[in-house]
């Protein structure tokens, strides 16, 4: 039986490092819409929804034919935002994919390959690359501390 897969794109206007980052434009199109349009090319996602904290984002999303759900400004991170957004959807999905809203160049084939990898390797819950030494002190890159079995202990900047 085919698994139902939902892509959720968390985005918020109150970015600390770059003010109103989702609204910044590349070739006249907001960054989060570029991300949405690229993710929409996935061959595996059954649905794709933007989870956001501001009506401005909802209105822009509608102009591009994107689905969007308003979430609380109190969400501490993207994971909380997609969880809150998912609770508002009246559909069941087998898998939920977190697609960061500031990835305008995301390759839809990579989305599909990560989903396929996870379906084949059911114990994997987070799939990510290793970090380069020169990026250890960079606050723009999330770091993961894992145990000897590769299980995530915590995430930090």
Question: Where on the chain are the PLM-derived regions?
Answer:
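Hydrophobic/aromatic residues located in beta-strands of well-ordered beta-sheets
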Residues: 7, 48-50, 96, 127, ...
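Short glycine-rich anion-binding loops that position phosphate/pyrophosphate groups of nucleotides
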Residues: 13-15, 101-104, 133
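Short, high-confidence coil segments that cap the C-terminus of an alpha-helix
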Residues: 45, 91-93, 121-124
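Short phosphate-binding loop-to-helix
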Residues: 49, 55-116
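Conserved core of the sugar-phosphate nucleotidyltransferase
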Residues: 106-157
């Amino acid at each position: 039986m085919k698994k139902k897969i939902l892509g959720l794109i968390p985005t918020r206007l109150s970015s600390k490092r770059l003010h109103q980052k989702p609204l910044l434009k590349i070739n006249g199109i907001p960054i989060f819409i570029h991300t949405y349009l690229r993710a929409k090319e996935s061959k595996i996602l059954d649905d794709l929804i933007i989870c956001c904290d501001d009506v401005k984002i909802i209105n822009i999303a509608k102009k591009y034919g994107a689905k969007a759900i308003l979430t609380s400004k109190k969400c501490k991170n993207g994971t909380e935002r997609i969880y809150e957004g998912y609770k508002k959807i009246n559909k069941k999905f087998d898998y939920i994919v977190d697609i960061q809203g500031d990835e305008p160049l995301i390759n839809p084939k990579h989305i599909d390959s990560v989903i396929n990898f996870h379906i084949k390797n059911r114990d994997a819950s987070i799939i990510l690359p290793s970090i380069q030494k020169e990026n250890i002190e960079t606050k723009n890159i999330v770091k993961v501390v894992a145990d000897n079995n590769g299980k995530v202990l915590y995430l930090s900047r």
